[in-house]
Amino acid sequence: MDPQDCACATGASCTCAGSCKCKNCKCTSCKKSCCSCCPAGCAKCAKSCVCKEPLSDKCSCCT
């Protein structure tokens, strides 16, 4: 199971899995996996992540 916080430097690559739900992920290589889902118009995710489907009314990185 992935940790809630990635332990890698800002902009660095890391080994986060595709299912990673790190809340404060700063890795350029895994920003796409910061959120497992997000509601439409989720501003917090839009700034730091490319959220994966399916969409939901709750977001793993905004709670």
UniProtKB/Swiss-Prot annotation:
Class I metallothioneins contain 2 metal-binding domains: four divalent ions are chelated within cluster A of the alpha domain and are coordinated via cysteinyl thiolate bridges to 11 cysteine ligands. Cluster B, the corresponding region within the beta domain, can ligate three divalent ions to 9 cysteines. Keywords: Metal-binding, Metal-thiolate cluster. Metallothioneins have a high content of cysteine residues that bind various heavy metals. PANTHER family: METALLOTHIONEIN, METALLOTHIONEIN-1X. The keyword rRNA-binding does not apply. Residues 31-63 are annotated as: Alpha. A divalent metal cation 5 binds at C35, C37, C38, C51. A divalent metal cation 1 binds at C6, C8, C22, C25. It comes from Podarcis siculus. It holds the Pfam family Metallothio. This is Metallothionein. InterPro entries: Metalthion_dom_sf (IPR017854), Metalthion_dom_sf_vert (IPR023587), Metalthion_vert (IPR000006), Metalthion_vert_metal_BS (IPR018064). A divalent metal cation 7 binds at C51, C59, C61, C62. SUPFAM superfamilies: Metallothionein (SSF57868). Residues 1-30 are annotated as: Beta. A divalent metal cation 3 binds at C16, C20, C25, C30.
